[in-house]
Amino acid sequence: MVQTDWWTLELESMPGFDLAMKRVYAWFEGAIIDRPPVRFMAHNAFVDQANQAYPSGDLRDRWFDAEFQVETFIKSIEGQTFHGETFPVFWPNLGPEVYAGFYGAELQYGEVTSWSIPLVRDWDDVARLKLDMDNVYLRKLDEITRCALERCAGRFLVGYTDLHPGVDCAAAWRDPQQLCMDMIEAPERVKALIEIAIRDFETIYDHFDSLLKEHRQLSVSWMGIPSFGRMHIPSCDFSSLKIGRASCRDR
């Protein structure tokens, strides 16, 4: 990761931000400035508090409440100083299968995650898969992102959502258990479905990245490791359901 297009970012909760970024960039190059990067994270640390505080019992309402999501995060970092390479990052989150929702799948919401209702019940349903950039989930992610951008200056970084194209998206469309069977019974159809699930990735990524870069934000998501350039975390959670040669071949 070469240090290019570097700009100054002042964060009141992280006075050592610039040096922390230099350590991260050095680590990617296999080098050390003064020590390796160190960070401290408790994933979903404030979820229980958020659940108790929300006035409605409708989980979808809570996930979709942009003001509440941003305010909850801000309260969670009040009075804190971020040490080492632990960065204060808010990233808009509608669940790991939201990528499938961009094509028409409906999401159901739980306390800490969401999941897709299978959209491709029959192989003929593949013809229905079209990216909709005006989709309810894309519009909501934009709203949450903009809400955070309005309040982040000097306080925290704003990132982009957890994107799972490819195999994970195909599994969300088809149902993970069914896709396991499909890999045995219809491997060519599976391959074609995965191709559809990844072909629009750059368009989707660029949509969110452009919005962040317009506001001089870095590229960062759930992992909490920022980049001044373009950064994405490749994901294939579905691989945990597969073993042997099929797993190695399709991953």
For each predicted feature, which ranges?
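Active-site loop segments of alpha/beta catalytic cores
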Residues: M1-D48, Q52-Y54, S76, H83-P92, ...
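N-terminal glycine-rich cofactor-binding segment that shapes the pocket for flavin-like pterin cofactors
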Residues: D58-E71, E78, F90-M133, K140
